[in-house]
Amino acid sequence: MPPLFHFVPSPMAGTVLYPLNELKQHEPEIWRREVAKYDGREQLLEMPIPPLGCLWNDVLHLSIVHPREIVAELEAAGVEPLRRRFLEFDAGVFDPERTVIFLNRPTDVAARSDDSQWLPFESANLDRLVELTEPTRRYNRECAMRRERPRLFAYLPHVFYRAALETRALPQLEV
C-alpha cells in the first residue's frame, strides 16, 4: 500500500492528531485556528460521510498523493508553495472499518456525498489514486492566473479516518 500523508499542524500540541470535533474538546485554541480554514466553506463541516456514518469534521483527512508531487505541480503552475512538514503514515495499519477513500471529484457541494465519490479502503484503490488529477492541475493554473493561493488538496482524493492518530514515532518529511 502506498503511504498516506498529513501536514504537521503548526504549532502542534502534543503528539496526537484529532478530528476537528475531538480537537475542539482537547485543544480549543488550536481548533479555532483549524476551523478558520473553512471560512466561506462552512457547509463542508456538516457534510455527511455516509460510508462511515459521520460528518466531515469527525474524521482526519489524509492525502494519497505524495506532498512532493503536489509542491512540484504548484511550482509548475506558477504558484510559490508554502513549505510544510508532513507526517507519513503506513496505510497498512488503518482499520478499514474506520477508513474510506473520498475521490473529491469536482461537483456542487450538495452532490459531494453521492455514492460515486466513495471507495472502500483497499490497496488496489489506493494504488490507482497516487497521481495528481487533471482537475487539480487546472484549478492550480486558474488560481495562478488570478494570483490567488490555491487550496493545497483541491480535487485530490483523500483518505478519511474516523479516529485520532498517535504521531510520536512517525517519519516526517519537509517539502
Language model features with spans:
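Active-site-proximal loop/hinge segments that shape catalytic or ion-binding/gating pockets
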Residues: 1-175
